[in-house]
Swiss-Prot record:
Belongs to the UPF0301 (AlgH) family. This is UPF0301 protein BCI_0481. Coiled coil: none annotated. One of its GO terms (cellular component) is cytosol. Gene3D superfamilies: VC0467-like, VC0467-like domains.
């Protein structure tokens, strides 16, 4: 099982504050473990414009299709001082890895320097930190029904309102995740 370019959808029983009602985009998954970015937990009052200001990058706003007021996300509890940019494919960035034909992840700031130019990716999602699983850990969590999984899509990743991503991802499976109960009983 390879869940690269899939979403993990937190089950309602997951109560850890970092992952409660979360959607995680899996960037890599192999025999060594998995790495993903939470895509629906924005950092309060921190936007792409804030990141650019902090990095002393002055965006060119005359051609900006990327919204500078979009939120920055808490991608997970690991390396939360590092930036990770998920974006639609565009060549020429220093530290990029292809996730799928529709998405890449970049950890170098050169992708941010292209915002507002014809070299910018069509869509971006900026996160601080990432979520990681050691070998076998994610598989164990899946067997414990901690997560639902679906193939990822760019509509949810980039265009769905942040507050609706958890429900929208579950809806692809044909379920209303709000109707799943947190407890089971015995007859």
């Amino acid at each position: 099982m390879n869940l690269q370019h899939h979403f993990l959808i937190a089950m309602p029983t997951l109560t850890d504050p970092l992952f409660k009602q979360s959607v995680v985009y899996i960037c890599t998954h192999n025999h060594e473990g998995a790495m993903g970015i939470v895509i629906n937990k924005p950092v309060e009052q921190f936007t792409v414009a804030s990141v650019l200001h902090k990095l002393k990058i002055i965006p060119i706003v005359d051609h900006a299709s990327v919204q500078l007021n979009q939120p920055v996300f808490l991608g997970g509890p690991l390396a939360d001082d590092r930036g990770f940019i998920i974006h639609t494919p565009k060549d020429g960035f220093g530290a990029s890895i292809g996730i799928s034909p529709q998405t890449m992840i970049t950890t170098s700031k050169d992708v941010l320097e292209t915002l507002g130019t014809h070299n910018q990716p069509d869509d971006i999602l900026v996160a601080l930190g990432y979520s990681g699983w050691e070998e076998g850990q994610l598989e164990h969590e899946l067997r414990a029904n901690t997560w639902l999984t679906i193939p990822a899509n760019n509509q949810i990743l980039f265009a769905t309102p942040v507050s609706a991503r958890w429900q929208a991802a579950a809806k692809i499976l044909g379920i209303n995740i709000n109707n799943i109960v947190n407890q089971i009983g015995h007859a």
